[in-house]
Every structure is written in C-alpha cells, then in structure tokens.
Amino acid sequence: RQGKVDVASILDAAVKKNGQKLDWKHSIVDLLKALDLDSSLTARKELASELGYTGDTSDSATMNIWLHKAVIKKLSENGGKVPAELLD
C-alpha cells in the first residue's frame, strides 16, 4: 500500500495556481474551489445530502461547517493525509 497523499500541500498548490486567496482549511466554499468543484449553494446542498447531512439545509452556515468537516474526513478516509487540527 502506498503512503498517504499530502492533502494540505496539494490544496495549497491548487490555491496558488487558482490565484485567489482561498482559506480551504476553514471554508467549504474555498475548499471546493481549491478542488475545482462547484461551490454554489445548490451544489453544497446536494453534496451535504450525499454525505448524510440531516440538518436544515436552509441554515447554510451550520450546513457549511458540517460539510467542511465531512469533506475533510472523507479525504482522510480515502488515503489523504490531513492536518490533525482539521479532524475532530
């Protein structure tokens, strides 16, 4: 089995390439942009649903916090080395 992928360095490089100031460690919108994924509210609601979010999607602030944690957790579960402070 190969070593874990360093998610932080890949995302930092993606942010640099993107040219925008993206705070992927704290913002789901910025994380999705760094991954070159749709970061619209509709897309985030769909992603939250796919990942098992059971809260109110009209409360986007709460959903975004949950979604950020869920995406980071998925990256970690799928072989990504994620900074420890980003995991619960």
What is each of the regions a protein language model found here?
Residues 1-88:
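Amphipathic alpha-helical interaction segments
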